[in-house]
Amino acid sequence: YSDFNLGTKVRHREDNDIWIAEWLNGSKGELNTWVAEDCDGIVSGLYEYDVAYRPEFADKLRFIPFPIDVKHAPLIADFAKVAFPPERPVRFFVGVQRSRSSYKGTDIMLRALRRLEAERPDEVQVVAVENLPFDEYKRAMLSCDVLLDQLYSYTPAMNALQAMAQGLVVVGGGEPESYDLLGCADIRPIINVLPDENDVYEKLRDLVDHKARIPQLSHESRLYTERYHDHLKVAQAYVDFWQSRKN
């Protein structure tokens, strides 16, 4: 599955159909192919990008994760030392961009979360914000325990990675293939969900049922970003790749 398909079924939406036409059959696709063929090296920052380019450009492709300034990403709490209070509800954060809600799967994730909130109002708090300035968005996000993000992704992207660096637990894309590409075998901090409302609901309910896990997942989320996404490590990987292609 992806932003554009579920198995062999294309996700027909107005903007999807336009992007497919432009990038597969139109001038943007032709330009992208020309650049890929002409350049000396290609960096893929996500599993999705890597699997798209590798069949045709494996000889010039290098996977380098997205960068996060982990050092300047303060933790929401030192959950390695503090247990999750059993009487406290779990606070879930959802950032809504109305124009991209269906594309990113926010509509489905929010419906699943609202179902759980209606059933267990004393155990679930939902913070849903729409089109906030970035500083306000960050403040709202950092008041929560869990971020819901990118239903159709195999991999956490920048919004999720920033949240993970600060100790939030992410519900979204965390398929085994993305961990394998990183060489990550010992931790699984992301609550991986399929693009299905019932699957999202079941995963959220399980997290609330076992909220004592949140401190460990929070700790692993920070560790994940430190290991694989630290901006200085990523910058050095770019330099090394550039040097290897230059020689």
Q: What are these model-predicted stretches?
A:
Residues 12-42:
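Membrane-proximal helix-turn-helix segments that form the acceptor-binding/catalytic region
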Residues 138, 160-165, 179-180:
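Short alpha-helical segment that forms part of, or immediately flanks, the ligand-binding pocket
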Residues 33-38, 42-44, 49-69:
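Helix-loop-beta element that forms the nucleotide-linked donor phosphate-binding surface
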Residues 212-243:
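A charged, aromatic-enriched C-terminal amphipathic alpha-helix characteristic of glycosyltransferases
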Residues 68, 72-75, 80-104, 110:
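Conserved donor-binding/catalytic core segment of Leloir-type glycosyltransferases
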Residues 142-155, 168:
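Acidic donor-binding loop of glycosyltransferase active sites
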